[in-house]
Amino acid sequence: MYNIILSIFYPIFLALVFPTQIFLFVVVVKYSPKYMQTLRNVLFCNCIFQTISVVLLCLLQLRQVSHLKPMEIWCYGPLRHFEAIISYCLYFVSQSTSVVSNILVLLTIYLKYEAAKNVTNKQSNKCIVIILLLVPVFVLVGAEIYSVVTHSLLPEVRYLFEVINSNVTDHSVIGYITLQTVPSYLIISIVFGSVFLLPPMGLYTRRKIIFHINSGRDTTSQLKKHQRKTFINGLTLQACLPLVSLCPIFVCYVIVIGTKSELLFEQYCISVLVLLPTFFDPYITLYSVAPYRKQIGMWLGKAKTGPMIVISSIMNL
C-alpha cells in the first residue's frame, strides 16, 4: 500500500518542487542587492544542494528496513535497475546534500543573528564560522567514502548484491546500515545533529533578534516594523519546520533501531519527510527576504517600483 502511494507521490512532488527551486535560484541570482552578497551565496548553494537532494531521493525512493539485522536499504525508484553500488553511492550523496542544506540553514541563521546585532564582524570571523560548520560535512563525506569502500567495492560484496538483485521486481537491495564501526556512528551522529540542532538554534536566534528589534522600537517606522515582522516570521518558520517534519520521524528512527521493531510508516516515510523542507524553504525565503518579496510584488502589480527602505540592521548580510 505504502509503495503504491509513494510511487505516485514522488513524481508529483518532484514536479512541484523542481520549478520552485529553479524560480528561487533565478530570483537569488538576478535580484539580490550588493549588500546581500553573503546571503546570496548561501542561498545559491542551498538551492543547488536541495535540488540535488530532491532529485536523488525521488529517483531512489528509499526504504530502510529497520527490523532486519543488519538494516537493509531498499530502492523502489528507477535506480533499482542499476548496479547496487551506484544506488548506494547516490544514497550517500542524497544524505550528504541534505545535511549540507541543514548546515547552510544554520549558517543563514547565524548571519541573521550577527546582522540583527548591527555589528560588522571581520571577514576572518565569518570564515572561521563557515569552516567550523563545514567540518562535520568533511567528516561525514569521509565516513561515507569509507563505508562505500568497505561495504560495496569488494568483489565478493558486489557479487552478493548481483545475486540478491538478479531478479528485480518492485525493489532492489542496495546496501546495509550497521552501527558496529566508528564511521557508521559518525554518519548517524552528524545526520541527527543537523536535524536536532536547527530548531533550538533558530528559536534562540529568533528570541535574540526580537530583543534587539524591541530595544529600538520607538525609532522604527511602520514600514521597517512590517519588514522586520515578516523577517521574524520567516525565521520562525525556518526554525520550526524541522521540528515538525523531521524531529518526530527521527525519534521514531532511534526507537526502531534500538528495539529492532518494524514500523512501516517510519521505513517508507522517513525519506518523504526529509524532502518536505525542500518544498517549503523556497516560499519561506521569498516571503522573509525583503528584496525578493518586493520583486515578486512588482511582478504581481501589488508593489510600486519606487525605492525600498532597507532594514540595514537585519538585512545587511
Swiss-Prot record:
Its main location: membrane. PANTHER family: SERPENTINE RECEPTOR CLASS DELTA-45-RELATED (PTHR22945:SF26), SERPENTINE RECEPTOR, CLASS D DELTA (PTHR22945). It comes from Caenorhabditis elegans. Keywords: Membrane, Transmembrane, Transmembrane helix. The chain crosses the membrane at residues 8-28, 42-62, 89-109, 128-148, 185-205, 239-259, 270-290. This is Serpentine receptor class delta-47. It is found in: Membrane. GO terms for cellular component: membrane.
